[in-house]
Amino acid sequence: MKYCFYYDESEHSRVINLSTVTGETYYDGFLAAIIGWRSDHETAFEQRYHAFEEKYSDRKKKGELKSGTIKPNQLVHGFASLNKANVKLIGDFFSTFDENSYIYLFCASKIEYIIIQIFKGYRNSVFFDMDAVRYSIVKAIVTYRPTEVIESLYKSPAEFVAALKTFLTNRIRCNKENLELKAQENTAFEAVLWILNNVDVPQSLAWDYHSQFVGFENFLSSKGILDYSVLIDKEGEAGVESKTLVSAKESGLNNCDEADSIDHFGIRMADMLVG
């Protein structure tokens, strides 16, 4: 039996810049969603989703009902801050899924990705837990949002490492004024500093588009699904395969293609799910 899957990414996408990271609405996660079902259930899902879209047709923009219909300020406190109309919309949306649905979600920290790239040549050892080192750096950046460190992140890996070392040194000094609460953090930061003083810094960084598809391939294997198609929301120049599609193929996925969401309800469903 063949299965039909549809892919979309959050509008946050892979964008990481100084204004987004220091902004109040910054979200560190890159999200991707792939939804699907057996091909013989396609018509039933399409009918349900079209009925959902027609119910909320007054919210459509350019002919599509998009996840952006729910504004960020409605989600400041999660479901608690949603108005009744949006609670109803979300409930109706999830009602379009049933026990025949397959849902795969992928989430990655954008800053963590950059840190992993810088330390990709380092592994755990009896002397250092590199996973803990990476975690400590990501947590420090996301928690304190040091402008000088974040700004350097978009210049070069070498400048980023230098700025991070300065920040950690200053943070350790400040923490010594309250060691009762900050002793554990200082221990972690001192370990990170030791690594940074000896790290072989790469010349440049580039986003890897493969991770979400490697995970999805494992998802398919776990479900015993061999015959399938994956349709990806088209991005970039017409007639040119996007990096997303190329990465899906390079990750081992078969029968992949991309298309405009306005022509495929499954892509629109994935968009509503991933936000």
State each model region's role.
Residues 1-275:
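Phosphate-ester processing/binding pockets and catalytic centers
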